[in-house]
Amino acid sequence: MKRLKAYLKDGINVAAVMCLGDTISQFFFDKKSLDEWDAGRTLRFGIVGLVFVGPTLRRWYHFLESRVPKTYSPMRRGVTKMLVDQTLFAPPFTMAMSFLVPLSNGEPIDRIRQRILDSYLSILVRNYMLWPAAQMLNFRFVPLGYQVLYAQFIALVWNCYLSMILNS
């Protein structure tokens, strides 16, 4: 039960930040008025955070913690975790998000496939402009129990970008 609560807590935190990111994206980047705001889109983006992003990140960070030797210096552990995260996790996670967000908005699979072909590489390149440094700080200085929350503060900016690209 304690483990379920931890997953739920992370899922709720991630959902809230993703909803905020989508709302910011709609108002500031899409220039929508309050009457034009697509609350359903915001809710769907948040649900992806609740059921996929939060639990996935929690599991991934615990996996990294268990696999990177604790005998490494703190700096080496942080660098190792960041490199593994950005090489093994970021590409498939980005692909999953590129699929799930449009799917949650009811886009047909053929359109999602084309969207991925058109935007996946540019999203991944931009991922590498932000996340390696952010994750290095996360894995080096943030205690394991707070790593998902820390990542979500960084993700507020990232989610605005993702929402803008994946909901266009």
UniProtKB/Swiss-Prot annotation:
It is found in: Mitochondrion inner membrane. It comes from the Eukaryota. The keyword Transit peptide does not apply. Disruption phenotype: No effect on lifespan under normal conditions but reduced lifespan under stress conditions such as starvation; adult flies show an increase in glycolytic flux. Reduced mitochondrial DNA copy number in the fat body, but not in skeletal muscle. Mitochondria in the fat body appear swollen and lack inner membrane cristae. Conditional RNAi-mediated knockdown in neuronal tissues results in significant defects in learning and locomotor functions in larvae but no defects in adults. Signal peptide: none annotated. One of its GO terms (molecular function) is monoatomic ion channel activity. InterPro entries: Mpv17_PMP22. The record marks D85 as: Determines ion selectivity. It is a multi-pass membrane protein. Its main location: mitochondrion. Keywords: Membrane, Mitochondrion, Mitochondrion inner membrane, Transmembrane, Transmembrane helix. One of its GO terms (cellular component) is mitochondrial inner membrane. One of its GO terms (biological process) is mitochondrion organization. The chain crosses the membrane at residues 12-29, 41-61, 82-101, 144-166. Belongs to the peroxisomal membrane protein PXMP2/4 family. Part of a larger complex that may be a homohexamer. Non-selective channel that modulates the membrane potential under normal conditions and oxidative stress, and is involved in mitochondrial homeostasis. Can translocate uridine, but not orotate, across a lipid membrane. Involved in maintenance of mitochondrial ultrastructure. May be involved in mitochondrial DNA (mtDNA) maintenance but does not appear to be directly involved in mitochondrial deoxynucleoside triphosphate (dNTP) pool homeostasis. May be involved in the regulation of reactive oxygen species metabolism and the control of oxidative phosphorylation. PANTHER family: PEROXISOMAL MEMBRANE PROTEIN 2, PXMP2 MPV17 (PTHR11266), PROTEIN MPV17 (PTHR11266:SF17). This is Mitochondrial inner membrane protein Mpv17.
